[in-house]
């Protein structure tokens, strides 16, 4: 198994820990969705590449901070997505990237329920 394939498996495992996440397809390639909405997909046009939902400000920061791992093509410039080289991205960055992408596409109620469940419980 290649590093890119292992990284994609790790991304799927991380994503599936979040509520409402399901694996599916998009444009004929493996995809990660939340309640049917696209969160990420493997890019068939770039082996080892992943398109991940990402807001524009964070995208600019990622492109500047780690250009070896993050990139953009003209097709994606107007979409809130970042392209990731799976064999170059730092795996310790994945949990936060995945959760932020999930928050962008998950229904507000699902996010609120997740936050309430994840919040530290107060002792009485």
Show which residues each predicted segment covers.
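Charge-dense, helix-prone N-terminal extensions
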Residues: 1-124
